[in-house]
Regions:
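Extended, low-hydrophobicity, polar/charged segments
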Residues: 1-130
């Protein structure tokens, strides 16, 4: 299903679907932010929490060579296994108890306990939405 528009399964709320965004910090290099698809990532907040002055989205043409995934398929588990990039999950996922993220292929997603995902990928919960 398309998370942004159209019908969703009855037990799926649009705000429980999260996008995994890859950015580049001016001091740390790549940094990953995970926010609801219905929201926008605050680059300013992510920069501050990750120890950067600024962060910017990694251009799509560089995404696969940086994360190992194409646009729309970034998976936090795979990114953590291949790279040691810092990962930040918006705190709304912690409050909700679970989230749905890409499973590493376009059109495939997994529903997972928020805390278990954070523990597994060594992520930090933070306020990173605009």
């Amino acid at each position: 299903f398309n998370g942004l528009e159209g019908e969703l399964p009855e037990d799926v709320a649009r705000e429980s679907i999260y996008k995994t965004l890859a950015l580049k910090g001016d001091k740390t290099g790549p940094v990953i932010g995970i926010v609801p698809i219905t929201e926008h990532l605050s680059e300013k907040k992510l920069a501050k929490i990750s120890g950067n002055k600024k962060v910017q989205m990694i251009p799509q043409k560089d995404l696969q060579k940086t994360t190992g995934y194409v646009h729309g398929a970034n998976n936090p588990v795979g990114i953590r296994q291949k790279h040691n990039f810092p990962i930040y999950i918006d705190h709304s996922a912690q409050d909700a108890g679970f989230l749905i993220v890409s499973a590493g292929e376009i059109g495939r997603s997994i529903r997972i306990n928020s805390q278990e995902l954070a523990d597994f990928v060594n992520a930090e919960f933070a306020d990173i939405k605009e």
